[in-house]
Amino acid sequence: MNAMTIRALLLTAVSIGAMAAHGQGEEYVIQGVFNPTLADAQKKDLRPLPIDTILPERPVSFDVIPVKASIPAKVDSLTAARLNVVQPQQKLYKGFVKAGFGLYTTPLGELYFDQARSRDNAWGLHVKHMSSAGGIKDVGPSRYSFNSVDGYYTQFLRNHEVGGRLMYDRRRVSHYGYDATDSVEALIANTVDVSEDARKQYYNDIGFAARVRSLYKDSTLIAHDVGLEVHAYSNLSGSKETNMRLTADLSKAEQGDRLGLGVLIDNNAYRGEMRNGLFGEVRSASLGDQRTNGTLIGLTPSITRQGDRYFVRIGACLYIDAQGKTSFHFFPRAFASYSLFDDILVPYLGIEGERRRNSFRSLTRENPWLIARPALQNSSQLYDVYGGLRGNFSSRVGFDVRASISATEDKPLYVSAPNGFFGDQMAVVYDRVGVFNLSGEISYRMDEVVRFHGRIDISQYDTDGEPEPWNLPPYQLAIGATYSLQNKLIASLEAQFLGARKAG
């Protein structure tokens, strides 16, 4: 090792020692000759090689580890369920008998007899009798009797049912509306020329009906219900009436709505003997017959939409009335209801209107003590706006309260015909009558055997031409009860109360 090398090593050692003694952060300059030596590097020869991207398939197997879960068995106590077993089809009886008895020796009897259940056809017979021996004090004999019999037959086809009905009804009433004093009874006994209908009246009604109704399962088809009813009606005095009524109800489902159309053709021919007196109550020499003929044609289109909670129906009534003179009538119709709390409360409101036929048959069925030939005039229910609330207080108690205001043009009112033989018959007059009505109905089901019901109607009337709403009650009250013994023996009791009516 030469002197230069030794000197360099010494300087390096001194420099390192000085740095250790004095710390870092100072600069030193070393002068000398530095000869770096580079060692020869041994490099590996690596070149890129292509790798096949298609990997070989390796079989994969899944093994389930057998593990047994320990689930202890536990039995819970269950409450016994109460099942109501209902037969698939309710048992039908071929016969049904109804009997009753009321005040003034008033027996009632009804008989129903039919074929019971059949897939092909159905037929039945109905007979009814109701009469009274009378007994009202200080007036004339008040006996009456109502008798009726009707039979029906219906044939079931694939998509329709076709049926017919024959009817006969006979009613007898007594004109008892006079004071039965000794002088009046003596006058009646000594009068020779007394007409047969002076103290009594008979009404005979012979009719038949036919019906064709569709039974489509597809609601998109036009469902139809067409009916024809004809009545030949007459009384003891010789008045006669023939009425033919054709009706058709059409409906079709369309995009969630129900489109409907009602058709009415009502033809009426009425003939009676002309008589003298204020209302035609005095029989005299033959004055000939007086005829009243007319045809009523009506259309009632409607559209109905029903949801889970609501029901809405909007429509109209259009009529052409050709009785005496031809007139056109239009009435709006609408109804809406909404269910609250799962049908516990259902508020509803609506408006109605229609043209009504007042026939000899309809008037004398409402008041059989009319004169021999009452005058006929059709009525118009201009409007009937109503609203109410129905629902259930509980599973046993149901109710319905309602308020309405209506007006009827040419409403029939019944007044006394003063010039009759005994002054005991009634005549009909027509007037515009407005009605404000409040009504309430309640029903109570004690159990499956006993049920009670009651209804009250309070009405306030307003007339145009007549001073009073003759023979219209200011209130009506009805209460009743029903007792059913296994649907084999049913006993009913009902009482009706009417407010004092003004007699004209």
Residue ranges and their predicted role:
Residues 22-87:
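N-terminal periplasmic/intermembrane-space "pro-region" immediately following the signal or transit peptide
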Residues 78-79, 88-137, 141-149:
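Outer-membrane beta-barrel translocator/receptor signature
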Residues 92, 97-100, 311-313, 319-323, ...:
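Exposed, low-structure sequence patches enriched in small/polar residues
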Residues 111-115, 125, 151-155, 208-214, ...:
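Residues on the lipid-exposed face of transmembrane beta-strands in outer-membrane beta-barrel proteins
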Residues 115-137, 260-268, 273-275, 290-321, ...:
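Surface-exposed extracellular loop regions of Gram-negative outer-membrane beta-barrel proteins
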Residues 120-123, 159-163, 217-224, 254-261, ...:
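Repeated loop/turn-to-beta-strand initiation elements of outer-membrane beta-barrel proteins
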Residues 132-144, 165-223, 227-243:
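Flexible loop and strand-edge segments within Gram-negative outer membrane beta-barrel domains
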